[in-house]
Swiss-Prot record:
It comes from Dehalococcoides mccartyi (strain ATCC BAA-2100 / JCM 16839 / KCTC 5957 / BAV1). It comes from the Bacteria. Catalyzes the transfer of the enolpyruvyl moiety of phosphoenolpyruvate (PEP) to the 5-hydroxyl of shikimate-3-phosphate (S3P) to produce enolpyruvyl shikimate-3-phosphate and inorganic phosphate. Pathway: Metabolic intermediate biosynthesis; chorismate biosynthesis; chorismate from D-erythrose 4-phosphate and phosphoenolpyruvate: step 6/7. Gene3D superfamilies: Enolpyruvate transferase domain. The active site is at residue 303. InterPro entries: Enolpyruvate_Tfrase_dom, Enolpyruvate_Tfrase_sf, EPSP_synthase, EPSP_synthase_CS, RNA3'P_cycl/enolpyr_Trfase_a/b. This is 3-phosphoshikimate 1-carboxyvinyltransferase. PROSITE patterns: EPSP_SYNTHASE_2. It is found in: Cytoplasm. Its EC number is 2.5.1.19. SUPFAM superfamilies: EPT/RTPC-like (SSF55205). GO terms for molecular function: 3-phosphoshikimate 1-carboxyvinyltransferase activity. Keywords: Amino-acid biosynthesis, Aromatic amino acid biosynthesis, Cytoplasm, Transferase.
């Protein structure tokens, strides 16, 4: 699907969807608890439905009759799957469930979607090998021969993806002797490890971590059933936060300003650029002001790259977005996708190994390739609605995390039409 955006000045009120990261973590924790848990206000999108589908294929009963407000999970009813378990394009589902399947006493085949096949799994596979697990990748399939895990020490790099570490944390309580996880390098995206620890705590799991988070210890212990409420998603909010900074005031509800989510830092970056930020209990308002360039380190908030780059393109002066190397191994090579998109819109941009240098200017409409990446589509959807005459390919990719994105943009006054 291709979207056409005419020039407009979108602004107004919007409620962002629930957090993908917290929904997936909550589902997997609830699946391992004895008894019934409730996930309140889950995100319903491709990635979370992938996790739900995989868990259902493993025998976990997830009752969704209550609709979108609550899912009821009866945990610890795992059984050998009757077929392949499809993870769609969800890296979190593939990585987290690879670890969970490793501690189940049967063979599992996890299938990856097309773009997910390109994303690295080796550090997690090597970590599971250290624990005695037989796991290998065959084309788009990860084959796991699970077993009772009696080894308790594992080491892996922390600087490639926090998801490998979170995967081990989610499986650790069910290991015979728990797990002691050593990170050979400082962790990237540290807030995501804190989110995993927070979720585990909600289900009764005690986690011990060193100050630098390079040593994590989780004793063997049972998951306890819980009522687990999912907060709003700061990553999904980031494009609309950028919109408020470059177009018209935007009021966003369902955002916890005390959240552990890494991408909460977006409002700090926008404030440093000159935007006016107001906030209260569960809401943020961004008012546009003349923006200046920024030096921003995105090491722990890599998903902000597209949205912050769009704001930088509209700012006066140069912006340097550093710590972005790992953006190359997301749903697309986001460094290349952002660079190509902004260049097509007339913005001077220099692409380096670990940073982007953006000279702010006056973007113009262009043909934008989203590369099937939801965050690229959303960020350029915002910019395209402000400058007009913009076409975005594969625009349906937003269903990965934000199915109502285009509808919400229209509700704010964006002129969005689907090309036929």
């Amino acid at each position: 699907m291709k979207i056409h955006l005419d020039k407009s000045l979108p602004g107004g009120n919007i409620a962002v969807p629930s957090s993908k990261s917290y929904t997936i973590r909550g589902l997997i924790a609830a699946a391992q608890a004895n008894g019934q848990s409730h996930i309140i206000s889950p995100l319903i999108a491709d990635d979370t439905l992938a996790t739900r589908q995989v868990l259902s294929g493993l025998g976990i009963n997830i009752n969704t009759d209550t609709g979108s407000e609550s899912w009821e999970i009866t945990g610890n009813t795992f059984k050998a799957p009757s077929g392949n378990l499809f993870c769609r394009e969800s890296a979190a589902t593939l990585r987290f469930m690879s670890a969970v399947c490793a501690r189940l006493p049967f063979e599992c085949h996890l299938l990856a979607g097309h773009s997910l096949m390109r994303r690295p799994m080796l550090p997690l596979i090597q970590a599971l090998h250290q624990l005695g697990i037989e796991i290998e990748t065959r084309g788009n399939t990860t084959v796991i021969n699970g077993q009772v895990i009696t080894r308790s020490k594992v080491s892996l790099p922390g600087n490639i993806s926090s998801q490998y570490v979170s995967a081990l944390m989610l499986m650790a309580p069910a290991c015979t002797h728990g797990l002691e996880i050593h990170l050979a390098t400082p962790p990237a995206s540290l807030p995501y490890l804190k989110m995993t620890k927070q979720t585990l705590g909600s289900f009764g799991i005690k986690v011990h971590s060193s100050i630098d988070w390079q040593e994590i210890s989780i004793p063997p212990q049972p998951y306890l059933p819980a009522r687990y409420r999912v907060e709003g998603d700061w990553s999904s909010a980031s494009s609309f936060l950028a919109l408020g900074a470059i177009a018209a005031p935007v009021f966003i509800s369902n955002l916890d300003t005390d959240s552990f989510q890494a991408d909460r830092i977006m409002i700090k970056f926008l404030a440093e650029m000159g935007a006016e930020i107001e906030s209260g209990q569960n809401w943020v308002k961004v008012n546009p002001k003349p923006l200046s360039g920024i030096n921003a380190d995105l090491t722990h908030s890599i998903d902000l790259l597209p949205a912050l780059a769009v704001a930088a393109a509209c700012a006066k002066g140069q912006s340097i977005l550093s710590g972005v190397r790992q953006a190359r191994i997301k749903e697309s090579n986001r460094i290349r996708a952002v660079s190509q998109g902004l260049s097509a819109m007339g913005i001077n941009i220099i692409e380096e190994d670990d940073r982007l240098i953006i000279e702010g200017g006056q973007p113009k409409g262009a043909e934008i390739d989203s590369f099937g990446d939801h965050r690229i589509a959303m960020a350029f959807g915002i910019l395209g609605s402000v400058v007009g005459e913009t076409h975005i390919s594969d625009a349906e990719c937003v269903t990965k995390t934000y199915p109502d994105f285009w509808k919400n943009l229209e509700s704010l006054g964006g002129k969005v039409t689907q090309d036929v």
